[in-house]
Amino acid sequence: GSPNFSVRLEKNVMTKGTLRKLIEECFSGDSDVALFYFSGHGHIDSVGGYLVTPDFSEYDYGVTLQDVLSIANNSKCKEKFIILDSCYSGFMGRINSKGQSTAVINEGVTILTASRSTESSVEMNGHGVFTALLLEALSGGAADILGHITPGGIYAYIDKALGPWEQRPVFKTNVTCFTSLRKVIPQVDIGVIRRICDYFCEENKELEMDPSFEPTNSPDVNHEVIKPYADPKNTSVFSELQKLEGIGLVIPVGEEHMYFAAMNSKSCKLTSLGKQYWRLVHNNLI
């Protein structure tokens, strides 16, 4: 995959002042993307939520979630991401006013938290469960067909992995489109996907196949063969069609497998997702 962001790792941040300074520095400047990730203790009271630091005391637990959000909201960076693996972190993005809780997230801000405002965050084998799933998602588990990993994809990956009775991740955003946080090698080369319009002249058109598409249907292979025999041009197309089937863009028509669709002179067609990518290719968007 692609290299990560320019990363600054800070371990054992001991004071509230130091953590506040690091958050300010993270969202300073005018870069395209700034991402703040915190894994540690969280606290909530009648006033709001906190990222707890070791120097905490009663009524002064650490950096408030409202301060973190205000810093991100006021940042000149184009896209601001806040990812929190701490107890009660789902309170992030809300303020209490006269007994009511209101969401206040400026444009360009995205928040992903390990749990809801009333939940603790589970730890297992030295890792927060949320962080372990986050790492899996960034390693490719949350990648789309093109290999892009977006905040929405990460949330969907983590959401599916956690059961209804476990801690629930929270996703809040105010953006017009998702930014890719990382790119990994896609399951199918982009060149193959871009040829989808070569094989299907229209998104609802089926591609007729015959035995010449199956590479093993050749007199050179010691088994029963059917005319027309394997044709190199068609077998090359068939190979790519099978790859597109593997990522859910193509399905055989009238048969369970692409092999039998070819050998029985059936056809294949685009799935609903395949039609979406057909339109993207047709309109030169990928």
Please annotate each region the language model reported:
Residues G17-I95:
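Caspase-like (clan CD) cysteine peptidase catalytic core
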